């Protein structure tokens, strides 16, 4: 929960971005959070009685759960559109948000993953970051494109005036 809560957005115009989506199906609890720039999905095996989904404030849920020191088992259930979190010694009723309002986190395509040294990542990013736009009005211009090419990873950034490209050899 603490990892998911760190990804939640602090956008007051879109309160759903401050939420964590909890979904249970087939004895798997899926925890999702996003700030629209970054999405996180964590799957945990659980004991369940029925499937369902609920979106609640990430900060409120994480604060409550992190303060449970003596209880190992936590029960989650929805009651009248809210989330009841209970243990042997305590419980909380947390206001829920409409699940349909939670943004869809894009699925990763079947592209082949590439692995390389973190120092190469830092070197590549530092080489092209000056070309990325500091404004978030057009996100594509404030981003860095990374893609594999033969034994290299190519880093590309532009703000529409400058273009930076760096090829970092990653073959070991």
Where are these regions (language model features)?
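Structural preference for solvent-exposed beta-strand-turn elements
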Residues: 1-172
